[in-house]
C-alpha cells in the first residue's frame, strides 16, 4: 500500500529554492554579458555572420 512521504521542512525548501534562483540569476547575468559583448563588437571568442540574410 502507498505511504505518503514525510513533509519537507520550510527551511530546506527555502534553501533549495534560493540555490536554484541563484544559479538562474548567475546564468542570466552571464548570458546578458555575452550578448552585450557580441553586440558591441568587443567579443573575441565568438564567430558569427554579421549580415545573415535567409532570403538569399
UniProtKB/Swiss-Prot annotation:
Subcellular location: Plastid, Chloroplast
MF-aspect GO terms: structural constituent of ribosome
Keywords of this entry: Chloroplast, Plastid, Ribonucleoprotein, Ribosomal protein
Family: Belongs to the bacterial ribosomal protein bL32 family.
HAMAP family tied to this protein: Ribosomal_bL32
PANTHER family per UniProt: 50S RIBOSOMAL PROTEIN L32, CHLOROPLASTIC, LARGE RIBOSOMAL SUBUNIT PROTEIN BL32C
Designated name of the protein: Large ribosomal subunit protein bL32c
Species in which this protein is naturally found: Huperzia lucidula (Shining clubmoss)
Lineage: Eukaryota, Viridiplantae, Streptophyta, Embryophyta, Tracheophyta
Amino acid at each position: 500500500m502507498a505511504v505518503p512521504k514525510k513533509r519537507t521542512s520550510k527551511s530546506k525548501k527555502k534553501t533549495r529554492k534560493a540555490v536554484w534562483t541563484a544559479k538562474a540569476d548567475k546564468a542570466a547575468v552571464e548570458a546578458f554579458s555575452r550578448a552585450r559583448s557580441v553586440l558591441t563588437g568587443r567579443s573575441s571568442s565568438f564567430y558569427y555572420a554579421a549580415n545573415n540574410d535567409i532570403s538569399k
